[in-house]
């Protein structure tokens, strides 16, 4: 399970990094920082560094430590993003974050794909819990 999660995370970060060169002036970056089982931070800012700094501050303010608040994902431009809650049998949970999508429907499809083999990976829950647009507006389910 952990290997697949890391592979998907690396793939998402790699694909989002490839889009960096296509950044349009004025578009914002997004960063998601997570301290597993403690806290997280999500920020949309003018550039990636500012978004990361802001998200780390939020994570720490929420109870995470500087050591545990790790960057989960960044995208510039941010596009549409989705926060996916994953919970393993036995209770541990974490969030997978996918960003940089050109349309909200694509972000939701990314969540669907991430959860497509959830039971095979020992997950008892896998669901999109937030959809974020490029301006940082957060929408919670249902996403209709």
Question: Each predicted region: which residue ranges?
Answer:
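Secreted/extracellular ectodomain signature
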Residues: 21-144
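Bacterial N-terminal signal peptides that target proteins for export
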Residues: 1-8
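N-terminal signal peptide c-region/cleavage motif recognized by signal peptidases
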Residues: 16-19
């Amino acid at each position: 399970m952990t290997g697949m999660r890391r592979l998907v995370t690396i793939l998402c970060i790699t694909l989002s990094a490839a889009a960096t060169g296509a950044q349009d002036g004025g578009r914002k970056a997004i960063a998601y920082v997570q301290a597993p089982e403690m806290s997280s931070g999500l920020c949309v800012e003018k550039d990636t560094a500012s978004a990361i700094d802001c998200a780390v501050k939020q994570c720490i303010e929420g109870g995470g430590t500087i050591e545990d608040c790790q960057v989960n994902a960044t995208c510039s431009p941010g596009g549409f993003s989705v926060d996916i809650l994953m919970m393993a049998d036995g209770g541990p949970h974490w969030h997978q974050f996918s960003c940089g999508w050109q349309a909200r429907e694509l972000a939701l499809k990314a969540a669907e794909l991430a959860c497509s083999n959830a039971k095979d990976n020992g997950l008892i829950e896998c669901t999109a819990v937030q959809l974020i647009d490029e301006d940082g507006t957060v929408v919670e389910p249902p996403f209709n």
